[in-house]
């Protein structure tokens, strides 16, 4: 069906060209968006025509009803949909015959005319001129119908956005969230900076990196897993408030909340600590939620989340002890192992830090409302400053919402000797087979030796945040072009064929 449709369209385009009609013109003078037209003319009475105002807009035809000498159709642009009405006695016989013969659902057109409100109260353009701007070679996809594999819509997101307004709107929200974050931080004096994506030594998180080869130097390099260590170098160099919003890469699995290529923001402030970062996190999240929804309460997966300040604070030690009966600071590794085995959890590397993380994984989903999880043990926090009152734990928090980590923050470790020793422990873990343990970064230690002021740092996962704000169940729904298993072009054509209409 797709092949026949495409061949027919190619013939039609050749026919248009023979008539000296360009099916792909270079530009169109669009003076109004659909949203502008609706707002400007919402005060019209049903049946009233605004004869003294001429509008020009363009978009894709999403529906079309032809009635002999007239037709109604809806045009979709980035801002919404607007109804258009074409009549033979208004545009003339030649233009109307062209419309009847060559304009179809899916075509991109430009229209010019006056605006009126229909008898049913819908703002409508009375067309005086219409111009074909693009004649697609493929039929319009129906909304999900017949598509056997949802991954088709991930592979061909442009099809998803054409067919489903919800998808387009979801990405509008995503990029509005990113804008709001930048606006908020810029207003507070933070400076957006850039750090390398290709690194000689990668660090700043516990993750397996992507490895590549730099031909010009004939050396192995890594794609960054986090921006932390270079952003701290900015603080050493004299910057006091910095952030970077961009892509990180971790060569790990896919899940509803994990994606190997993901977007995050990291924020660093000199002369601040993790308490300051908690306040900043609350303020930022409330700012975003109120800007988008006009309230601090939203629904996610049928659960009401309340972002009103202040948020709950819990200590990792206390929460695990309450729910599992094990003390992660006092109990032996054997006791922790027993509890994990009771819950059917396998521990590949029998290290205290790994066991603590596995224990937390068992109880994380019990935290639903915005909550700060505090005071992670030193073993799982190699870049965080030790707590000023208990050196067994760190001045660190994670923001947990709906059982998911949304943010991670520290009072940043700025003691170069302590940092070097913690790197050594990470190296020992790597040598024992832990591919996610951090590498030794001697240049970063050298930077700390020049002196870094007390600093608070914060990292936020943009994709997970957008999941919450768009009520999306999986991370791939909020990444425009996510990773999917490869299929041949021919296999993809078969998958999409059932979801097309002529």
Swiss-Prot record:
Cofactor note: Binds 3 Mg(2+) ions per subunit.
Catalytic activity: tRNA(Lys) + L-lysine + ATP = L-lysyl-tRNA(Lys) + AMP + diphosphate
A cellular component term, taken from the record's GO annotations: cytosol
InterPro entries found in the cross-reference section: Aa-tRNA-synt_II (IPR004364), aa-tRNA-synth_II (IPR006195), aa-tRNA-synth_II/BPL/LPL (IPR045864), Lys-tRNA-ligase_II (IPR002313), Lys-tRNA-ligase_II_bac/euk (IPR034762), Lys-tRNA-ligase_II_N (IPR044136), Lys-tRNA-synth_II_C (IPR018149), NA-bd_OB-fold (IPR012340)
One annotated GO biological process: lysyl-tRNA aminoacylation
Cofactor: Mg(2+)
Binding positions for Mg(2+) 2 per the UniProt entry: 405
Residues at which Mg(2+) 1 binds: 398, 405
Subcellular location: Cytoplasm
SUPFAM superfamilies attached to this UniProt entry: Class II aaRS and biotin synthetases, Nucleic acid-binding proteins
Keyword line: Aminoacyl-tRNA synthetase, ATP-binding, Cytoplasm, Ligase, Magnesium, Metal-binding, Nucleotide-binding, Protein biosynthesis
Segments forming a coiled coil: none
Gene Ontology molecular function terms on file: ATP binding; lysine-tRNA ligase activity; magnesium ion binding; tRNA binding
EC number(s) from the headed UniProt entry: 6.1.1.6
Assembly behavior: Homodimer.
NCBIfam families (UniProt xref): lysS_bact, PRK00484.1
Protein family membership: Belongs to the class-II aminoacyl-tRNA synthetase family.
Name the record gives this protein: Lysine--tRNA ligase
Source species of the chain: Thermosipho melanesiensis (strain DSM 12029 / CIP 104789 / BI429)
Recorded name of the encoding gene: lysS
């Amino acid at each position: 069906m797709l092949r026949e449709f495409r061949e027919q369209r190619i013939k039609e385009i050749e026919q248009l060209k023979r008539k000296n009609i360009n099916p792909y013109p270079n530009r169109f003078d669009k003076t109004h968006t659909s949203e502008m037209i609706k707002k400007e003319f919402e005060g019209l009475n049903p049946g009233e025509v605004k004869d003294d105002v001429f509008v020009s807009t363009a978009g894709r035809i999403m529906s079309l009803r032809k009635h002999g000498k007239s037709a109604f159709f809806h045009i979709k642009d980035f801002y919404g949909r607007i109804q258009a009405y074409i009549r033979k006695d208004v545009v003339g016989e030649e233009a109307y015959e062209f419309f009847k013969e060559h304009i179809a659902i899916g075509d991109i057109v430009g229209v010019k005319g006056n605006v009126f409100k229909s008898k049913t109260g819908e703002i409508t353009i009375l067309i005086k001129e219409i111009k074909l701007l693009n004649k697609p070679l493929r039929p319009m996809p129906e909304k999900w119908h017949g598509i056997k594999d949802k991954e088709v819509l991930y592979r061909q997101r442009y099809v998803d956005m054409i067919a489903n307004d919800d998808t387009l709107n979801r990405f509008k929200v995503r990029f509005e969230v990113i804008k709001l974050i930048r606006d908020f931080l810029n207003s507070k004096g933070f400076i957006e900076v850039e750090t390398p994506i290709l690194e000689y030594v990668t660090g700043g998180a516990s993750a397996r990196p992507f490895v590549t080869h730099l031909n010009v130097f004939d050396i192995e390099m890594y794609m960054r897993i986090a921006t932390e260590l270079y952003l701290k170098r900015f603080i050493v160099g004299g910057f006091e408030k910095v952030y970077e919003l961009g892509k990180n890469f971790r060569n790990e699995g896919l899940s509803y909340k994990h994606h190997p290529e993901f977007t995050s923001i990291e924020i660093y402030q000199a002369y601040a600590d993790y308490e300051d970062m908690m306040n900043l996190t609350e303020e930022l999240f409330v700012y975003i939620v109120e800007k988008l929804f006009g309230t601090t309460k939203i629904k996610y997966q049928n659960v009401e989340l309340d972002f009103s300040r202040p948020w709950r604070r819990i200590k990792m030690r206390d929460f695990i002890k309450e729910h599992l009966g094990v003390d992660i600071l006092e109990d032996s590794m054997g006791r922790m192992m027993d509890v994990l085995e009771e819950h059917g959890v396998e521990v590949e590397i029998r290290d205290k830090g790994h066991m603590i993380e596995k224990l937390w994984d068992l109880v994380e989903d019990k935290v639903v409302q915005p909550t700060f999880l505090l005071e992670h043990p030193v073993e799982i926090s190699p870049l965080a400053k030790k707590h000023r009152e208990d050196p067994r734990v760190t001045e660190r928090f994670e923001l947990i919402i709906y059982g998911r980590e949304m943010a991670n923050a520290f009072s940043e470790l700025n003691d170069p000797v302590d940092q070097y020793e913690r790197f050594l422990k990470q190296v020992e873990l790597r040598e024992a087979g832990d591919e996610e343990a951090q590498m030794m970064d001697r240049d970063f230690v050298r930077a700390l030796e020049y002196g870094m002021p007390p600093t608070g740092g914060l990292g936020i996962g943009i994709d997970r945040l957008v999941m919450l704000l768009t009520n999306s169940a999986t991370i791939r729904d909020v990444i425009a072009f996510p990773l999917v298993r490869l299929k041949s072009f021919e296999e993809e054509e078969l998958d999409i064929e059932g979801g097309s209409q002529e």
